[in-house]
């Protein structure tokens, strides 16, 4: 990287080295890209991360097990519910605690609503980044209503701290179920409207089709997860293939990229996989709300006040909005983790940018970053 930055550029050609960031509206956080260009064509774009590093993992090792839960909200502030859940499951495995069925249903309901809200931000900002502002406003309108319901459930709109080791903090408020079902009725009509507005727009499709294609082999090799992996044609979803919580009780499809507008694995496929996932998340929430009344009322397992798991190690994996989120926790028998490691989808997504950016137009870098749906705190932690 130093050679790239310090090399003297020949004034007789159009080569330039640009800093794209670290404070740029299209980078979706404090991220920098060192872009080597030849005219309007990129030779490569190198991610330069670390601006938002906060020692989250070390904090998890010096904070008691329950005390670390609010910090997990800061790993992915756009969809914090999954960071809560992944950590809770890891500690529950160490304690050998069985979570009550109702709490598992509540985790699925809150998680899938947050997945919809996160994808609305992803597809909305993607359209805005390439020049279409109206779809972003439509997405924010729907997201704000979801945030209202999440706030009524747990008291927060962004950093939820809803999960507890052994269950969840609150049950459904009175009337909440009927309001969410009514919202889903409207939302299911909104998705076709959104498709008519932007998805099937010829200009939009041409802007994303055959751009920054990630092959199936590349996606697997770089360890991509979630919509980025499925957008490349890999049929893999933790909720279905390694089911956890209440997910074995629900019927849903896993959208996979098919080259809808161009090549399998291009920007459009990654975009449209997220659109289809919102439909499936709505379907899961419906099923959960219709059956949660059949579960016992307990929302918390019996967990000791001073959490001191036996010595051992566990790995938990959940399907977040950005793909597989994993926690590796090592216990030494005390009330603090000896080692805590989190794995997120945004970090692996960043790693592939240098490999696939060569030959793209400079303007396509914005489309590429948006299609990967990276969130800066997930990268640096």
Curated annotation (Swiss-Prot):
Gene3D superfamilies in the record: Cytochrome-c3 Hydrogenase, chain B (1.10.645.10)
Record GO cellular component, one term: plasma membrane
The keyword NAD is assigned to this record: yes
UniProt enzyme class: translocase
InterPro entries, A to Z: NADH_Q_OxRdtase_suD, NDH1_su_D/H, NiFe-Hase_large
Tagged with keyword Kinase: no
GO MF term list: NAD binding; NADH:ubiquinone reductase (non-electrogenic) activity; quinone binding
Record membrane topology: Peripheral membrane protein
SUPFAM superfamilies: HydB/Nqo4-like
Substrates-to-products reaction catalysed: a quinone + NADH + 5 H(+)(in) = a quinol + NAD(+) + 4 H(+)(out)
EC nos: 7.1.1.-
Localization terms from the record: Cell inner membrane
Assembly description: NDH-1 is composed of 14 different subunits. Subunits NuoB, C, D, E, F, and G constitute the peripheral sector of the complex.
PANTHER family (UniProt xref): NADH DEHYDROGENASE [UBIQUINONE] IRON-SULFUR PROTEIN 2, MITOCHONDRIAL (PTHR11993:SF10), NADH-UBIQUINONE OXIDOREDUCTASE 49 KDA SUBUNIT (PTHR11993)
Function of the protein: NDH-1 shuttles electrons from NADH, via FMN and iron-sulfur (Fe-S) centers, to quinones in the respiratory chain. The immediate electron acceptor for the enzyme in this species is believed to be ubiquinone. Couples the redox reaction to proton translocation (for every two electrons transferred, four hydrogen ions are translocated across the cytoplasmic membrane), and thus conserves the redox energy in a proton gradient.
Family label: Belongs to the complex I 49 kDa subunit family.
Name of the protein in question: NADH-quinone oxidoreductase subunit D 1
Source organism per UniProt: Anaeromyxobacter sp. (strain Fw109-5)
Gene: nuoD1
């Amino acid at each position: 990287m130093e050679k790239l930055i310090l090399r003297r550029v020949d004034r007789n050609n159009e080569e330039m080295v640009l800093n794209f960031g670290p404070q740029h509206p299209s980078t979706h956080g404090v991220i920098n890209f060192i872009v080597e260009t030849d005219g309007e064509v990129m030779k490569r774009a190198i991610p330069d991360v670390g601006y938002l590093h906060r020692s989250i993992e070390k904090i998890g090792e010096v904070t008691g097990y329950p005390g670390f839960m609010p910090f997990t909200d800061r790993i992915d502030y756009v969809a914090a519910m999954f960071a809560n859940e992944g950590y809770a499951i890891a500690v529950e495995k160490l304690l050998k605690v069985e979570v009550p069925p109702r709490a598992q249903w509540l985790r699925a309901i809150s998680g899938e609503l947050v997945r919809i809200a996160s994808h609305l931000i992803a597809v909305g900002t993607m359209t805005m980044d390439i020049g279409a502002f109206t779809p972003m406003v439509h997405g924010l309108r729907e997201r704000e209503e979801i945030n209202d319901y999440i706030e009524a459930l747990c008291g927060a709109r962004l950093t939820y701290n809803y999960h507890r080791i052994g269950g969840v903090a609150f049950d459904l408020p009175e009337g909440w179920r009927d309001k969410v079902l009514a919202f889903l009725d409207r939302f299911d009509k909104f998705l076709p409207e959104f498709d008519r507005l932007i998805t099937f727009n010829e200009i939009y499709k041409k802007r994303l089709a055959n751009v920054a294609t990630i092959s199936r082999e590349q996606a697997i090799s770089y360890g991509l997860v979630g919509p980025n992996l499925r957008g490349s044609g890999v049929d893999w979803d933790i909720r279905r293939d390694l089911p956890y919580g209440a997910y074995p009780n629900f019927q849903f499809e896993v959208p996979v990229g098919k080259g809808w507008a161009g090549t399998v694995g291009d920007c459009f496929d990654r975009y449209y996989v997220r659109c289809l996932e919102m439909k499936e998340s709505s379907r899961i929430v419906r099923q959960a709300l219709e059956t949660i009344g059949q579960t016992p009322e307990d929302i918390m397992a019996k967990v000791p006040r001073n959490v001191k798991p036996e010595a051992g190690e566990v790995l938990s994996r959940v399907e977040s909005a950005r793909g597989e989120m994993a926690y590796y926790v090592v216990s030494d028998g005390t009330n603090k983790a000896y080692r805590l490691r989190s794995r997120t989808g945004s970090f692996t997504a960043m790693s592939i940018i240098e490999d696939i950016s060569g030959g793209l137009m400079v303007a396509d870098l914005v489309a590429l970053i948006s299609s990967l749906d990276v969130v800066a705190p997930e990268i640096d932690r």
